[in-house]
């Protein structure tokens, strides 16, 4: 999915990706809203529980079918508490993505923040792909009154935190943290090589 996000990216837009059809719908970022990415901790999915999450969600799909089509009512069909929590994260995250797209189009910043914060809570508690360092970074970013919401991003187990922030506030908070990058609205992605 990372490669598709990069290849299909459009400056100043979010990309809503349908992972079944691979259709991409671009949604413009409202004026005055910026995306901040903070590198928190080096990570590698090798040696993490990432493959466990893949196996757990595959097991859930054996029980209730494709998670893409599942609803919270389907959770009652899962007896194992751990698998139920993994499924709950995926099911509710799918719904949050659609709600986020609608809130972005409507420029409902409070709702955008609520959805990001709930996503992080679910990643941390139900899917368990966060860690204390990442949780602390999310809490710290949320202390800035200009931040609407923050969450971990990517495969989890370290890596980056992303936040949505109003541009109208002073940037002093961010200048004190050299690992934060404000993503320019006018830049397009390029390729990187080692």
What do the predicted segments below correspond to?
Residues 8-151, 164-194:
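C-terminal nucleotide
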Residues 158-162:
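N-terminal pre-core extensions flanking Radical SAM catalytic domains
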């Amino acid at each position: 999915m990372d490669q598709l996000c990069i290849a299909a990216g459009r400056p100043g837009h979010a990309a809503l990706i349908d992972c079944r059809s691979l259709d991409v719908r671009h949604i413009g970022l409202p004026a005055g809203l910026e995306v901040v990415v903070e590198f928190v901790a080096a990570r590698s999915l090798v040696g993490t529980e990432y493959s466990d999450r893949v196996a757990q969600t595959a097991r859930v799909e054996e029980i209730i079918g494709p998670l893409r089509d599942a609803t919270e009512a389907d959770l009652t069909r899962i007896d194992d508490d751990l698998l139920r929590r993994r499924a709950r994260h995926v099911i509710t995250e799918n719904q949050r993505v659609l709600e986020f797209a609608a809130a972005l189009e409507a420029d409902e910043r409070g709702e955008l923040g609520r959805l990001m914060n709930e996503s992080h809570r679910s990643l941390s508690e139900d899917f368990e792909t966060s860690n204390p360092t990442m949780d602390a970074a999310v809490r710290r970013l949320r202390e800035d009154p200009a931040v609407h919401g923050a969450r971990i991003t990517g495969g989890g187990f370290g890596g980056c935190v992303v936040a949505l922030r109003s541009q109208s506030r002073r940037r002093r908070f961010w200048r004190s943290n050299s690992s934060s990058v404000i993503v320019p609205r006018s830049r397009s992605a390029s390729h990187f090589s080692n």
